[in-house]
Amino acid sequence: MRLSRIGTPKVSVTRVIPVRNVVIARRKPVRASNTDAKTWLMKEEQRRIRQKEQEMKQRLEELERFKTKVQKSYIRKEDRHLAQEIEKDLDIITDDYNLDSDVDLVFGELMQAEEQPKSLKSLPGASDASDNTDKSVELFSFPSPNLTLPEKVIHHIGPLVKHISNPENIQWGRLLLDLEKNQGFNGLSAVDVTRLIQNIPKEEKYQHMSLIHEMMFNSGISPDRYLTDLMMTAFSERSYYEPLVEALFQDYDINGWAPTDYTFGALIKVYSKGKKLDKINNLLNQMKLKYHKEPNKKIYTMVLQTCMKIDDYKKTSEVFDAMKFNSVATNPDTTAYGSMILMHVLNDNVEAALDLYDNLETEPDETILLALARGCSSRKVLINRGWDFIIEYYKRKFPLNEKLMTVMMYLTSRDGDLSLTRAIYNTIHESRFKMTESFSMNKNDGIALNVLLRGYFKYPDNHTVQSKTNDAVVALRRSTLALNHFGYHPKATPFLPVNELEEKHILPEVQAIWSYIILHYPDIVTSELVGTYLMILATRGSMADFNKAFEELTLKPVFEQVDNAVAVEEESEQSSELSDLRLTPLAIRLSSNIQIKYPRNHDIYHIALQACINNKDIELGQRIWQERGRFRKTPEFSMQPRNVKHNQDFEFARDMLKLLVNCNELNDACRLLLSTETQFNWEWTYVKPVYIMAEQLGDEYAKKVVRRVVRNKKSKWREEYLQGM
């Protein structure tokens, strides 16, 4: 044993520790058998198949829905297209917006007689085919892209397709006759016929519908609802097809179809053409009670225009109010507003027209502005407002035409601006001459001529005209006068070559213009023109001038006697006093040989009595009074409404009373008052001149007559009269 350095022996001890032999074995993965794997794979595949099937099913359903949607959309598009075509045929913007230069002629335009039905052979293009066809047309082998004829129709036409290659030269009558000879409508459906009709211009459809209807019958084609609508709208263009339109309407009840707005529109349109307001009212009631439909805006507008055609002012206002207050969908549009404003103006209710314009919810069109300006020309206090509408017309860049210039003449004539009236009238004819290089006048030119003559009658008017104070109008006036050239052609209207006329030149110029018209354009002369010319002579000419024109231009009345024999007033013998022909212009001498005479009516007698008042001619006045008494027996007077006859009689009696007072015939004035005491409402304002004359002459009897006449009336002037006694 060895000892350590420090003396301690080193002892080695060995400890035996037993070690357990631990074996950690790696766990092997459990592997599925082949059968389980196949089952799992099969289920997984089935799941994926089911998923794909579900996806495919969803896609198929989506495609089916899309297909259905496309089909419905196409059908709706077709329906909408057909509806639009029918609606186009029901367009209600008719002749009452094609105004002449004078809006007062609207009724004349609307009341024009319609043409009578024509036979098929007399229709344009209905003659047999001719071999002399245009070679350029034959070069085309297919219809124009503007035409959408059904393929079957094109096949039936065959070589005749050249007739429809140029849409501007289509002879529909000839084409349909050739089609009838070549299989007609055999093999065609109602839709094919509908598309064929849609290609025919609206204004020609009604001419060919009889032949089309016959071919449909021969081919056994039963019209569907759309084709029936289209046929109704085509036939509704003429009032004499009313029974046929009504028969087609009965097919709706027979087939169980629900009438559409277009169906009712066609019926109302044909009733409107015939001015059958009662039938329209019955149909509107049926729409509400039987079919539970409210009239739409177009139907209301057609009813509105029908009321205008028959000059039923009250009914027109009622229809317009119904449009305003029924619903938002029927609110009047510009067309309806224009119709109502025009109706107000035509019935001298300008204030109502202005109120309507102030409440206008749409932009005004040219018709509205011109109608309002024309209406304002009837009131002196509204002249400036009328010019505002003209300036608005210019700002909106509406066409500058004769219609506008004629309305401007109304304003200048009423305002007493003769210089501008003459310049505008001359500009109208100078512009027309520069465009056509010829002189011509028609009936419408008589309107502007009448306005021009009124300008002479109202000039001078001791007030400052609006065209000299309104800044915008001043510029227009200045340019018009500066560009005016009276001597643009030797055959032009014979104006004196000056813009400003002197008083002494007015009557000679009027007489020269009248002779010029009688010599060159006697066809445009009307009774209104004759009346205006006579009024100028009554106020500016001598009694001799008036008497001469009165006898030359008017005819005495024809009236029925008790024994039923017709009596004619004898024409007075021409005066033996001949005027100095050397001092009479050649045109006036020539025009005096042209016989243009119009029967005397109330207006002519009123003018004649005014001439007697101005010239204090009691003798002629008494003859006029007696002659008018015989005129009252004529059909022209007796056929008028009772209130019209009463008003005309009262107006003439007031004129006669004024003549008697002016001629100091106090006793005759009293006899007139007593003889008509119970017939007329003699208010103080009418009899005041008689009382003043009686006061001046100290005639107590005449004063007593005036008191009696006034006291027997419930006059609003009675208190004023009693206070002034």
From Swiss-Prot:
Species in which this protein is naturally found: Komagataella phaffii (strain GS115 / ATCC 20864) (Yeast)
Family: Belongs to the CCM1 family.
Transit peptide region: 1-21
Residue ranges of PPR repeats: 189-223, 224-259, 260-290, 296-330, 333-363, 401-435, 601-635
Subcellular location: Mitochondrion
Summary of subunit composition and partner proteins: Binds to mitochondrial small subunit 15S rRNA.
Entry keyword annotation includes Phosphoprotein: no
Protein name in the entry: Mitochondrial 15S rRNA processing factor CCM1
General remark: Involved in mitochondrial-nuclear incompatibility, a major determinant in reproductive isolation between species, through hybrid incompatibility of Ccm1 and its interacting partner 15S rRNA between yeast species.
